[in-house]
Regions:
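GHKL-family ATPase ATP-binding module
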Residues: 1-11, 18, 40-42, 50-52, ...
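C-terminal interaction appendages of subunits in large macromolecular complexes
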Residues: 383-403, 418-423, 434, 438-440, ...
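Residues immediately C-terminal
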Residues: 50-51, 78-79, 504-505
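Surface-exposed acidic, glycine/proline-enriched linker/cap segments
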Residues: 94, 100-106, 286, 464-479
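Short conserved segment of the HATPase_c
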Residues: 81-101
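Conserved short strand/loop->alpha-helix "switch" segment adjacent to the catalytic nucleotide/phosphoryl-transfer site
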Residues: 23-42
Length: 648
């Protein structure tokens, strides 16, 4: 008989010191995957950034060592080296006690990022090793910690030094906590570059000692103006970078933007130099102030007739890349969530709205020719948006005959009507689509073969997108609208799975489809509903009949291992395309939820994603070739070349 679970006084545990962090790390850094791993670096860097923001130190050095430990060095004031009133060295208190720090009042930092009083101690808790070195008052001090923040000895003065003041922290993430402890250089690089854009004039030095070695220096005297230019590299711009700054209600506000000939908006926002990926009140204020300025200008100039339909704020922002940076005093700072993805400060909305409205109104009056062209551009965007709304309404309820015409002979639907369980496979080619139809679980899996050419939506207007048969069919099938009218909650499917051949043509189709989802159904990606299927490259078989042994391999490395296990006398099949697999093989390897491998598509960094889409799908051939040469290797097989990322 099973022992009954008891809940009494002895069930209550008290976690001391940093135990709580190690027990529930996700509460402090979001996750224990690569995102949480990166957060450790960001927390230490943000402390150095706060010093620079306060006016102390003009350089921050970050080094990734060969063993994936990380060193962050700044040239600020250095942590206090005396004894704390608790009886421990102040440095030890900062690095081992949660909610201990110098950012809770304006005395030391008027504005700051990081997890106040939590960041550095959390990093220590989740590291197998940490060492701190502080130079202050002409002396150097050091202390080490192991196994989750346990001090090794105590703080020591190691002697006098002529080194500049500052703090150096080295830490090694604990392998028993994180699913991976291998940093991806490009991700850290983008984050450090962002910090350099935001801290005008401060130099950031990033070094990677692993193979292949990297070394970058970032310093931008034009601040976020340079950031906007960086975002728009590779795009055809139709305005100069405009820049506003000012103080409003105790907050320091910077806003920079530039229009391109593209069709999407890209607003990147920060509060106290911390990226607010989920937006918040400051973004709402920027958008409302922007819209008010444009609407008033258009009315004063007689650009909107009495019968003219309203122009939405999103219409005015079509093709706009912008960066918003707000510095908010501690007493007003409110974030939603520990990792600070969304700003909740109510006063920020009105403050940003007021400044952006005032400055943008003046800019439009001073640049009349450009302003009139932007209003016309917004009117065209409005017309396209209304066409998108019409398509959404048709795909959801109305015009059933039209919907039936579009999907006739194309979609093989699932039997279930449950959008929380259903999956849609976008399959390259008719032959593979046929195998997928036969091999699927018809209860919840739908198949949509892609027969014609998928449009490059990076270069297309919304009106042209509706004319493309393949894209139009996808819009109707998913049933949640498109563009600004897209509502992810209306999607007919919980997963949309892109299934293509493992060759360069298949990779190109993947990029075209991902570009469409990124541009016009981005919430599908943000909610983790878009996937790429991974069909195997090889099939090994030894023997025949019921006693035969079958093994599939997805990489050349797996193939080599399987060949050793098989021994002699096996047959090898190299799949040149999905169509070469029969229905049973396709189900077992690529479609069965119990055995398949899928890649979930994520947007880790909006600015980086924007640049990648522009590079891969834009008009600049040289930029695309350069990126491919530096980031992708081509491994030749029987059927041509397979794209494999160097970093994966």
């Amino acid at each position: 008989m099973a022992k009954a679970n008891t809940y009494d006084d002895s069930s209550i545990q008290i976690l001391h010191g940093l135990e709580a962090v190690r027990k529930r790390p996700g509460m402090y850094i979001g996750s224990t995957d690569i995102h949480g791993l990166n957060q450790l670096v960001y927390e230490i860097v943000d402390n150095s950034v706060d010093e620079a923001m306060a006016g102390f130190g003009k350089e921050i050095d970050v080094t990734i060592h060969k063993d994936n430990s990380v060193t962050v060095r700044d040239f600020g004031r250095g942590m206090p080296t005396g004894m704390h009133k608790s009886g421990k060295p102040t440095i030890e208190v900062i690095l081992t006690v949660l909610h201990a720090g110098g950012k809770f009042t304006e005395q030391n930092y008027k504005t700051s990022g990081g997890l106040h009083g939590v960041g550095s101690s959390v990093v220590n808790a989740l590291s197998s090793y940490m060492k701190v070195r502080v130079v202050r008052d002409g002396k150097a001090y050091e202390e080490e910690f192991k196994n989750g923040g346990h001090p090794v000895g105590t703080l020591k003065c190691v002697g006098k030094t002529k080194d500049k003041t500052g703090t150096t922290i080295t830490f090694k993430p604990d392998q028993t906590i994180f699913s991976t402890t291998k940093y991806k250089y490009e991700t850290i690089q983008e984050r450090i570059r962002e910090s350099a854009f935001l801290l005008k004039g401060v130099k950031f030095v990033l070094t990677d000692e692993r193979e292949p070695e990297h070394h970058d220096v970032f310093q931008y005297d034009d601040g976020i103006k340079s950031f906007v230019s960086y975002l728009n590299e590779g795009k055809g711009t139709i305005s100069d970078v405009f820049y506003f700054e000012g103080k409003q209600d105790g907050m320091e506000i910077e806003f920079a933007g530039q229009y391109s000939d593209g069709y999407s908006e890209n607003l990147v926002s920060f509060v106290n130099n911390v990226r607010t990926g989920d937006g918040g009140t400051h973004e709402s204020g920027a958008r409302s102030g922007f819209t008010r300025a444009f609407n008033e200008y258009a009315k004063k100039q007689g650009l909107l007739g009495k019968k003219d339909k309203n122009i939405d704020g999103s219409d005015y922002r079509e093709g706009l890349s912008a960066v918003l940076s707000v510095k908010i005093p501690e007493e007003l700072l409110e974030f939603e969530g520990q990792t600070k993805g969304k700003l909740g400060t109510p006063q920020a909305r009105s403050a940003v709205d007021s400044l952006v409205y005032e400055k943008m109104s003046y800019y439009l009056m001073e640049n009349g020719e450009l302003a009139q062209e932007l209003v016309k551009k917004a009117q065209r965007a409005r017309d396209a948006r209304e066409a998108a709304k019409k398509a959404r309404d048709e795909s959801r309820n109305g015009k059933k005959r039209r919907k039936k015409e579009v999907l006739s002979g194309k979609l093989t639907p699932a039997q279930s009507r449950n959008p929380k369980k259903n999956e849609l496979f976008l399959v390259e080619g008719d032959s593979a689509g046929g195998s997928a139809k036969q091999g699927r679980d018809r209860r919840f899996q739908a198949i949509l073969p892609l027969r014609g050419k998928v449009l490059n939506t990076q270069k297309a207007k919304l009106q042209d997108i509706f004319k493309n048969e393949e894209i139009n069919t996808m819009i109707y099938t998913i049933g949640a609208g498109v563009g600004t009218e897209f509502n992810v909650d209306d999607s007919n499917y919980d997963k949309v799975i892109i299934m293509t051949d493992a060759d360069d043509d298949g990779a190109h189709i993947q990029i075209l489809l991902l570009t469409f989802f990124y541009r016009y159904m981005r919430p599908m990606i943000e909610k983790g509903k878009v996937y790429i299927a991974l069909p195997p490259l090889y099939r090994l078989q030894k023997g025949r009949g019921k006693k035969s042994k079958i093994q599939y391999a997805w990489t050349d490395e797996e193939l080599a291992e399987d060949e050793k296990k098989m021994g002699r006398g096996y047959s090898l099949q190299r799949f040149k395309g999905l169509g070469e697999m029969n229905a049973e093989q396709l189900w077992q390897t690529t479609m069965d939820p119990e055995s398949r491998m899928l890649i979930r598509v994520k947007i880790d960094d909006a600015a980086l994603a924007e640049r990648r889409v522009t590079t891969l799908m834009g008009d600049k051939v040289a930029a695309r070739r350069k990126w491919i040469e530096e980031n992708v290797k081509f491994r030749m097989g029987e059927d041509g070349s397979i794209l494999e990322s160097e970093d994966e």
